[in-house]
Amino acid sequence: MLTHLDSQGRANMVDVTEKAVTSREATAEAVVRMRPETLQLIQDGGHPKGDVFAVARIAGIQAAKRTHELIPLCHPLLLTSVKVELQAEAPDAVRIRARCRLAGQTGVEMEALTAASVAALTIYDMCKAVDRGMLIEQVQLLEKLGGKSGHYRKEEEGQA
């Protein structure tokens, strides 16, 4: 059942008024593939626009806080923690992990996914002058904790 549709099939924001406040957490990731020279430029700190990872981290945090303004049926949330980590993966990728937490009545999956996505887009924006062929991939929810649906963890490749 799609919870964002009413009985007539119209889009609406889910009413969470009666839901209990519980601890909730979600982790998402995105991967940016690029030329090895682009990754080296980022790692060497030689990018003319500045520290690519620092700017992408701040962009991801900011995006998580503004998810409800970007995705129409998301609730505005009082996030208690947003962490965005970026890891260079030689020879040609950056892996972004975003984790969002709160005590609330609805989950934070969209906030984590938005944080990872916008951090990836920021890397693209900062590096497009030297590498227009970058690829953003594997935007996905890795783990979700809390709420009525319980615990979800993406299975590793090759697991049943």
Curated annotation (Swiss-Prot):
A GO molecular-function annotation: cyclic pyranopterin monophosphate synthase activity
Keyword Glycoprotein carried by entry: no
Entry binding sites for substrate: L73, C74, H75, M110, E111
UniProt-annotated catalytic positions: D125
GO BP terms: Mo-molybdopterin cofactor biosynthetic process
UniProt keyword Lyase, yes or no: yes
SUPFAM superfamilies with a match to the protein in the record: Molybdenum cofactor biosynthesis protein C, MoaC
Swiss-Prot/TrEMBL keywords: Lyase, Molybdenum cofactor biosynthesis
Catalytically driven reaction(s): (8S)-3',8-cyclo-7,8-dihydroguanosine 5'-triphosphate = cyclic pyranopterin phosphate + diphosphate
Protein function: Catalyzes the conversion of (8S)-3',8-cyclo-7,8-dihydroguanosine 5'-triphosphate to cyclic pyranopterin monophosphate (cPMP).
Entries under NCBIfam families matching the protein: moaC, PRK09364.1
HAMAP family assigned to the protein according to its UniProt record, in alphabetical order: MoaC_B
Subunit structure, as described in the record: Homohexamer; trimer of dimers.
Protein name per Swiss-Prot or TrEMBL: Cyclic pyranopterin monophosphate synthase
Lineage start: Bacteria, Pseudomonadati, Pseudomonadota, Gammaproteobacteria, Pseudomonadales
Encoding gene, per UniProt annotation: moaC
